């Protein structure tokens, strides 16, 4: 069975498309939206006492319980828009980076003006996503351009020798 397309799409190698897909899933999906937004209970500005809400204002890195899901810290919209930098990297369009940064700034400003995020939420979202993009880029450069995932063989877990904690502890 063929699970991945072997040819270049838009003249971009498979490795680079896998890089962008991984940035989307890991950066915006897992780290920003699943971990920070759902585990960091910072209330949105509209929900704080200072803006006629019921919850108190909290500093960005303080993990509190004023919001259950889809909380303020960090901004998923800014994270998703920061992924445009990853796409620009694979298209080798450094001249467009200025436009990407302007777009990220405008999205951040819009989210702040709507009362959905604090300034720190948008800045930290950009920093977290940018670091993930750069780390993944450096990792993916070690893979061949014509990355063919169809040639990978699945692990046969029935042949794996499992060790218990008792086996690994010499006491």
Where do the protein language model's features map onto the residues?
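Interfacial segments of alpha-helical transmembrane regions
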Residues: 2-39
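Membrane-interfacial segments
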Residues: 3-8, 35, 39-44, 95, ...
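Alpha-helical transmembrane segments of multi-pass membrane proteins, especially transporters
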Residues: 20, 24-25, 51, 125-126
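Membrane-water interface at transmembrane helix exits
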Residues: 27, 31-32, 36-41, 89, ...
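Generic hydrophobic alpha-helical membrane-span motif
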Residues: 34, 38, 47, 82-83, ...
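Membrane-interface interhelical connector segments
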Residues: 39-67
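Membrane-embedded catalytic cores of phosphoryl/pyrophosphoryl-handling enzymes
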Residues: 56-162
């Amino acid at each position: 069975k063929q699970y991945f397309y072997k040819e270049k799409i838009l003249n971009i190698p498979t490795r680079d498309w896998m890089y962008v897909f991984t940035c989307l899933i890991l950066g915006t999906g897992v780290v920003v939206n699943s971990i920070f937004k759902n585990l960091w209970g910072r209330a949105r500005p509209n929900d704080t006492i200072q803006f006629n809400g019921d919850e108190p204002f909290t500093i960005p890195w303080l993990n509190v319980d004023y919001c259950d899901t889809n909380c303020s810290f960090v901004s998923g919209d800014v994270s998703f828009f920061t992924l445009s930098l990853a796409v620009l990297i694979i298209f080798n369009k450094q001249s467009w980076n200025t436009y990407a940064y302007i777009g990220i700034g405008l999205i951040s400003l819009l989210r702040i003006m709507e009362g959905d995020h604090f300034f720190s939420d948008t800045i930290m979202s950009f920093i977290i996503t940018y670091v993930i993009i750069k780390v993944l880029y450096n990792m993916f450069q070690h893979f061949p351009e014509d990355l063919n995932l169809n040639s990978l063989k699945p692990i046969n877990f029935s042949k794996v020798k499992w060790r218990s904690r008792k086996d690994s502890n010499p006491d």
